[in-house]
Structures are given as structure tokens and as C-alpha cells.
Amino acid sequence: MDDPILTIEEREAINSGRWFSSLSPSLRHDILRCAFVKRFKDGDLIAARGDPPDHWIACAKGAVRVSSTAVSGKQVTLTYVEPGIWFGDVAMFDGDRRTHDSYSHGDTTILCVARADFQKILASHVELYEALMRLQARRIRTLFGLVEDLNTLPL
């Protein structure tokens, strides 16, 4: 059974994350109050492509490998989500199923907020919308940079 409490190191990783630490104390409190802990061993499946968006997730320890599997069966790693990073919010907004597989990389602890709690937090903390928009903007800028590099760097 999962230990329902974050360790001191895991809590510090969440609290010191660039995005999360920028939120108001009351919003951070409400997010953490609703969250629950899940622990995984190296290589465990956390979420599969096609899964419903049941949770908003933060990595607290280890890493989450986000990947896609080609028709040929080749698995392509898209990114590693490190401690302090939140993810899965896009599916929470649009309600579509998960678009990629996610696996634990090393012993991994994640913090999860159920979809219903996510919606309640959004309703009581309008600032979360703006904060998530800033997070998405940062992700889009990073993506544009990667696309630019792919198109301009020599092979």
C-alpha cells in the first residue's frame, strides 16, 4: 500500500517547483489538501494512452517518462517529467483521453489531484486559470524552440 504522506524531500520538491511556488499560499494549500500520493517502482505504467483524464499529476520523486509507441512497436521517449513539475492538465481541461504513455523512471512518487477536486479548486481559485495559462505558454515556447532547432540545426 502507498504511504499516503509525502516525505520531507518529496514535499520540498513539490513546494520548490518553479510554477507551484509562484501560486498563492491559499491555492497551494487547497491543491495539497485535495492531493493523494502514489508510488511506483522503476518501469511501472502510470497512465496509458487512451486512459480517461482522472487525475492532474505532479512528480515528487524520481521521474516520469512520457512516451509514444509507433506502429512498428518502437517506443519513442518524448520527455522526462522531473520532481516539482505538474502535468496532465491539458486532458483535465478538454476531457479527451490521455495522448501518451507515462512510466516511472526509477522509484517514483507522484501527487495526484482527482478531476472533481481539480474542478472545485478552479471554481474557488480563479487565479489557477491564469497560472495554468502561464504554464501552457511556457510549454508552447519550449515546443516552438524545439521545432525551430529541428528545422535549422544541421543533421
What kind of region is each of these model predictions?
Residues 1-155:
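Cytosolic regulatory regions built on CNB/CRP/Popeye-like sensor folds
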